[in-house]
Amino acid sequence: MLNTTTNPFKPSAGHLPPVLIGRDLVLDDFREGLDNGSGAPGRLMRITGARGIGKTVILTEFRNIAERRGWQTISETASAGMAQRLLSRLQPQKGSFSFSFEPSVSISNVGGSLGGVHYERASIPLTLREAMSARLDTLEKRNVGLLVTIDEAQAADRADMVAIATAVQHLISEDRNLSLVFAGLPSMSSKWLNDNVMTFLRRAQPERLGDIPLGEVSNAFVDTFHSSGIILKGEPLRIATQATAGYPFMIQLVGYHIWRVVRRNHDLWRYCCFCGWWFVVELLRQ
């Protein structure tokens, strides 16, 4: 009998699965970055990998880790106007503002900022750097910081990336309690890291997400199904594990459909576990 009526596997884009397997090293790198303070490698990170490999899931878990420590987090997905949206979310809660975004600006009395983004209250310009600094002033009084994550970074406009990279570079040089993590397809590296204007991003700690070792997949299947009152072992377990090829999305998809069919066919599954493996074979063929 199943111990839960909710399928524990989540084969949908970006959904955080109940158990995140095979990513301990990258998660530990991020935690150490938060622990070790400004300038720690894990606070400036770039994550690459194929579609479906779990980049969005990792960013979600990073935000969860930071929020459990009291940090404020801002999540963005790269598209036109990303820097403008980031600035809007950083604006003070009071006042009347006029927003503008320019790929290249020159503002008197404000330090040089490539790809400057600013909004105005009266005649006082506020750059993205200043907006982030103002938010950090508040957060650092409570000994917490700000995490910004950017997904699909390979699709970002150059002006947006220049504005964000420039602001973050200045703030890191000032030892502010800030972390930036950006993720994208492998093409992101050649697109942004070879841009002379954004050499700062080359110093981001690289984390390449690959397939999950099959041994870890097998263990995760055993534990996850067992928590639902299902015994998956022997040949059925081997076939299910092999079918995933260690690909994170396939782990969720295979697990989801096995759990779904088991829920509908309790007696048949009981026969499969003790007398054969054809049940899983037929399921995976479907």
Please report, for each region that a protein language model flagged, where it lies by residue.
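A short, basic N-terminal segment
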Residues: M1-R43, R89-P92, S106, S173
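Walker A/P-loop nucleotide-binding motif
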Residues: P41-E61
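Conserved catalytic segments around the Walker B and adjacent sensor/switch elements
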Residues: R46, T60-M82
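Conserved NTP-binding/hydrolysis module of P-loop NTPases
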Residues: E67-T73, A83-V117
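Conserved Walker B catalytic segment
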Residues: Y119-P186, N194-V197
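Conserved small helical "lid"/interfacial subdomain of P-loop NTPases
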Residues: L209-P236, V254
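A short helix-loop-helix "switch/interaction" segment in the helical subdomain of ASCE P-loop NTPases
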Residues: E235-F249
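Winged-helix-like regulatory helical subdomains adjacent to P-loop NTPase cores
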Residues: G246, Q252-Q286
